[in-house]
């Protein structure tokens, strides 16, 4: 078994078979990253392939863009997802558009890794989940892993993809799954998705994972909230499908529609604020495709429409109780 940190090191090592793959960002070289996800990689692969950058997210992204359109496959790290916004112009206006702008002559195989979400008492600027700010941008692919196993498979697919990929990593899950209890810090040692093969394997971008199978409600989530939903379903006593979306763009429409058509009920759970969150896009898409099969309104359990708080973090993040309440409401109709 291994942690997400160890998995990340294995994945980059595995992808290093392609000498065009390089990794850089703030503190990722000598120090091994603020969460130690690149620990030992510089020593193994050399300073020319794993190196530190200045504290400039815009500069990191711009450098990766130039490298990408000239034949390299950069894997960059934005130290926290909250810090990605100085790089927004380079990601949205350059990386995402170069294939279309050049008529397919150029492409930009850049993977942008960034720790996201709450659960570490990071306050306003170390806790956000800004995935919906990128799912709205044509030309980008957006991934949000949840376990060591899918983190490796998805990251290899992202690195080998010819388009830019935003790869969100739930920082609360680096050392173990998060079931919603801030006082309990489990490790990955006993989780079935913690076993990470040493061999090269990929999980296709756009494929969801059916984590739990049931027949009375469909619960959809991604990142750390997948484990919160797992706990909620267990405690609710309601038979539910739990879908770990894994990739938000493109998302697995077929798997979701098949499940909601079967259960007739749906709960979508994410950490980001409710208004204009990706759950709203999913709810609209599900309603368009499953209207005649829905037995109750689609429920969303999300963060609140406020900046991420520090002292009341556990009231902000969706917990099992809120998810259970939503599941029960779907059964009352």
Describe the role of every protein-language-model region:
Residues 3, 41, 46-48:
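Flexible, compositionally biased loop and terminal segments
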Residues 1-8, 12:
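Single conserved hydrophobic/aromatic residue that forms the stacking wall/gate
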Residues 14, 63, 154-158, 258-259, ...:
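CheY-like receiver
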Residues 13-40:
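N-terminal glycine-rich anion-binding loops that anchor highly charged ligand groups
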Residues 36-44, 57, 106-113, 171-172, ...:
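Thiamine diphosphate
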Residues 48, 55-59, 65-220, 226-228, ...:
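Conserved thiamine diphosphate
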């Amino acid at each position: 078994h291994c942690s997400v940190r160890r998995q990340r090191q294995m994945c980059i090592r595995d992808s290093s078979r392609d000498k065009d793959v390089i990794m850089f960002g703030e503190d990722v070289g000598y120090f091994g990253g603020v969460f130690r996800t690149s620990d030992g990689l510089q020593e193994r692969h050399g300073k020319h392939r794993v190196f530190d950058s200045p504290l400039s997210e815009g500069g990191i992204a711009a450098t990766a863009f130039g490298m990408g359109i000239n034949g390299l496959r950069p894997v960059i790290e934005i130290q926290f997802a909250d810090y990605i916004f100085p790089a927004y112009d380079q990601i949205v206006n350059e990386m995402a558009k170069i294939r279309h702008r050049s008529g397919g002559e150029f492409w930009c195989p850049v993977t942008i890794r960034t720790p996201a979400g709450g659960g570490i008492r990071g306050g306003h600027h170390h806790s956000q989940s800004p995935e919906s700010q990128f799912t709205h941008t044509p030309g980008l692919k957006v991934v949000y892993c949840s376990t060591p196993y899918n983190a490796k498979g998805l990251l290899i697919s992202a690195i080998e993809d010819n388009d830019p990929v935003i790869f969100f990593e739930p920082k609360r899950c680096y050392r173990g799954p998060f079931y919603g209890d801030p006082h309990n810090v489990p490790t990955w040692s006993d989780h079935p998705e913690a076993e990470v093969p040493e061999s090269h394997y990929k999980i296709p971008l756009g494929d969801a994972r059916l984590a739990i199978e049931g027949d009375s409600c469909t619960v959809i989530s991604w990142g750390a909230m997948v484990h919160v939903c797992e706990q909620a379903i267990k405690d609710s006593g309601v038979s539910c499908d739990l879908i770990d979306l894994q990739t938000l763009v493109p998302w697995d429409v077929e798997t979701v529609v098949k499940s909601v058509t079967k259960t007739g009920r749906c709960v979508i759970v994410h950490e980001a604020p409710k208004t204009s969150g990706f759950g709203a896009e999913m709810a609209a898409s599900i309603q368009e495709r499953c209207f005649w099969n829905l037995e109750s309104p689609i429920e969303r359990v999300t963060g609140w429409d406020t900046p991420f708080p520090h002292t009341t973090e556990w009231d902000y993040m969706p917990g099992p109780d809120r998810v259970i309440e939503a599941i029960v409401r779907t059964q009352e109709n």
